[in-house]
């Protein structure tokens, strides 16, 4: 059984709109919006929605996640970024709200390491298979141990990258934890 997609456009501001692609199980597929992240969720049978917006490379000083929050009209605390860190022994993924920062010391403690540093951006792209600004925690080329910031549990649905810029996945945080076999910890700072 494959997935079919239906698209609905929601007005946001007077001059912008957001396109939501709702995934549902079906015998037919249109082949739209398929990334390794969506394929991983479909194979696992986990419910999710995809949200698309027009990405602009202008004004990126605040980062890709803040751009998503602004264009979608959502609280940046509900949109999460995926960051790859290196503990020396292994690389691990930390998922934190786009409005905050990854606390590397807390991430290291959460995985039982003494310290952690941000992975080289080129290595992050190579190991995940995604471009910066589009790194999804799902469907990565190399699977890493993953920690989700515990603030995600306050929401019934959060957004993470769907595997490319301008393409996010809306998912229940418990479902995300299940899909990733991840743990939670207070790894975000504001």
In which residue ranges do the predicted regions lie?
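Extended, low-hydrophobicity, polar/charged segments
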Residues: 5-190
